[in-house]
Amino acid sequence: TKVDLTVEKGSDAKTLVLNIKYTRPGDTLAEVELRQHGSEEWEPMTKKGNLWEVKSAKPLTGPMNFRFLSKGGMKNVFDEVIPTAFTVGKTYTPEYN
C-alpha cells in the first residue's frame, strides 16, 4: 500500500483539504480521520469529490496524524505526517513503521 497526501487549495490555519492517493489494488478509502498533535481525539474528515476536508474552530496543530479505513477493511495509522506550517501544493508521504 502506498499513500501520498497532497495539501490542496482551500487549506489554511483552520482548514485542511487533502487529495489522498491510496494505492492498494482492488481497494479504496472508506474513512479518513485526523488527530492533531497533543490531542487524544480522532476527527473525521469529510469526503468532497476526490478531496478530504476537515475544518477546526481553532488553528490546526501539527504534526498531524491520520487514520485510514479502507472499504476492504484495512486499517492504517500514520503518525506525524503533516506539519503545522504545511505548504499548499506539497505532497507528504508517510513513513511506514
Curated annotation (Swiss-Prot):
Disulphides: none
GO biological process, one term: plant-type cell wall loosening
GO CC term, one of those recorded: extracellular region
InterPro entries in the record: Allergen_Lolp2, Expansin_CBD, Expansin_CBD_sf
Subcellular location: Secreted
Keywords per UniProt: Allergen, Secreted
A family per Pfam: Expansin_C
Residue ranges of domain Expansin-like CBD in the record: 14-94
Family, similarity comment: Belongs to the expansin family. Expansin B subfamily.
Protein name (record): Pollen allergen Lol p 3
Natural source organism: Lolium perenne (Perennial ryegrass)
